[in-house]
From Swiss-Prot:
Taxonomy of the source species: Eukaryota, Metazoa, Chordata, Craniata, Vertebrata
GO molecular function: proton transmembrane transporter activity
InterPro entries assigned to the protein according to its UniProt record, in alphabetical order: ATP8_mammal, ATP8_metazoa
Protein's job: Mitochondrial membrane ATP synthase (F(1)F(0) ATP synthase or Complex V) produces ATP from ADP in the presence of a proton gradient across the membrane which is generated by electron transport complexes of the respiratory chain. F-type ATPases consist of two structural domains, F(1) - containing the extramembraneous catalytic core and F(0) - containing the membrane proton channel, linked together by a central stalk and a peripheral stalk. During catalysis, ATP synthesis in the catalytic domain of F(1) is coupled via a rotary mechanism of the central stalk subunits to proton translocation.
Modification sites for N6-acetyllysine: K54, K57
Name assigned to this protein: ATP synthase protein 8
Sequence similarity: Belongs to the ATPase protein 8 family.
Highest taxon above the source species: Eukaryota
Subcellular location: Mitochondrion membrane
Record's bilayer topology term: Single-pass membrane protein
Pfam families per record: ATP-synt_8
Post-translational modification N6-succinyllysine, affected residues: K54
Assembly mode: F-type ATPases have 2 components, CF(1) - the catalytic core - and CF(0) - the membrane proton channel. Component of an ATP synthase complex composed of ATP5PB, ATP5MC1, ATP5F1E, ATP5PD, ATP5ME, ATP5PF, ATP5MF, MT-ATP6, MT-ATP8, ATP5F1A, ATP5F1B, ATP5F1D, ATP5F1C, ATP5PO, ATP5MG, ATP5MK and ATP5MJ. Interacts with PRICKLE3.
Keywords: Acetylation, ATP synthesis, CF(0), Hydrogen ion transport, Ion transport, Membrane, Mitochondrion, Transmembrane, Transmembrane helix, Transport
Length: 67
């Protein structure tokens, strides 16, 4: 059974790591960031629903009187 030749693994892994690092740096350098990030005001509106104005009670089937 032949032995696995691992003599080129170090060069392969090193060159792959350097290439990925360079590609990532190039990708980040082309990204445009906002110059002055500010929070946008959020407009909240109150919605009135019919059940908000009156009291409601929810009956679960187990709390109903026995028949």
């Amino acid at each position: 059974m032949p032995q696995l030749d691992t003599s080129t693994w170090f060069i392969t892994i090193t060159s792959m790591t350097i290439t990925l690092f360079i590609m990532f740096q190039l990708k980040l350098s082309k990204h445009s960031y906002p110059s002055n990030p500010e929070l946008k005001p959020i407009n909240t509106s109150m919605h009135t629903t019919p059940w908000e104005s009156k009291w409601t009670k929810i009956y679960s089937p187990l709390s109903l009187p026995q028949q």
